[in-house]
Amino acid sequence: MRITAISAAAALMVLSVSSSLMAQRPDDQIDPRSLALLQEGRTAKAAGNLDGAQDALESALAVDPRNREAFLVLADIARTRGLPGKAIRFYGEALALEPNDLGALRGQGEALVAKGATAKAKENLAKIKTACGGECNDATLLAASIAKGPPVTATAQVEPAKPAPAKP
């Protein structure tokens, strides 16, 4: 009797584990709804509708958070809006999914340069050179961005106060 109960429990466990594994998709298979939203976001971005593009891309990531391309387009939108910190985060999410994505490494490096973190950008350049076996287009573009340096930003300059004339 005891063996029958244990056997039944083991069979039930094997059945439930195997059926749950069959329902999962492989990592490289992105949900088609997410891909459709990605395309919608790209179209909106090309039309200049950055808010609509961002909404569609965020929806694509809600449907399937493994959509690396959606992170890359969101990072490009953030850079277009002058938000390099946000772009760095999106590129980091894409790199978490695929650490050797040359476009993400270059984009993150350029965003790091925009923030003034050239040392980190040089680390990305070294990773790109290692991944592509020397010089490649992404390495050349990032090296040029590093050589150019961070963009000059306008700051509010306050002229020193003139001393008040002395009263006799």
Where do the language-model regions lie?
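Alpha-helical segment of the N-proximal tetratricopeptide repeat
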Residues: 32-63
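Canonical tetratricopeptide repeat
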Residues: 73-74, 107, 141-145
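Canonical positions in the second alpha-helix
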Residues: 60, 93-94, 127-128
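Terminal, low-structured helical/coil segments at or just beyond the last alpha-helical repeat
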Residues: 25-34, 123-168
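Position-specific recognition of the canonical hydrophobic site in helix A of tetratricopeptide repeat
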Residues: 45, 62, 75-79, 113
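Structural marker of alpha-solenoid helical repeat scaffolds
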Residues: 63, 97, 130-134
